[in-house]
Amino acid sequence: SQSWKRAIRKYFETHVDSESVGDRSKRIPEKIARKVQDHEGWDAERAQAAVSELFKSAGIKTEVDSRKLKALKDSGEATQEELNAAQYPQTKYLLFLSPHQIVRAAEAIVEADGEKIKKKEAQEILDTQHSVDMALFGRMVADDAAFNIDASVQVAHALGIHASAPEFDYFTAVDDLAEEGEETGAGMIGTVQMMSSTLYRYATVN
């Protein structure tokens, strides 16, 4: 059911006004911070700190992926752009926000100009004017159930309508870089189990 819903959301990206389609990502704080940086007087460090404070006020935890940042620094091969990107805070789970909520969050941070945004305002920013796909499929926020949105669409799992017996698929693969005459057999041989059936799928809209 999740893969079906994702396919519908991807379809929306090309067939529905982009302002009506939300983003579902751990990197939502980064997207907001980059919009804040478009305003004069806001560098990356200041924007990152302000976004973290906004989410903290709303009761949503954020963190910098310190292991990824350390790995990039230790590699000695990371570009400055990659290092900068790794310093943005992320949520601990995929967060679903509409374009309006993202823009409004950035505007609120700029208007506050370093002042703390109150809890009620922060929660209102992240919980009004939802996107079309959010209204359809709902939203769950682990940190605060008040942000949850009931879905208007229920998508069932695809179910096989008859008994199916597992079959074994035998496969071989050739090594593209093997020298001629170096190896006479296959680069890989194996079997995988597979099943096939006629599927029954349905969705209901409230």
Write out the residue ranges for each language-model feature:
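RAMP-family (Cas7-like) RNA-binding scaffold and associated basic/acidic loop-rich RNA-contact surfaces
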Residues: D17-N206
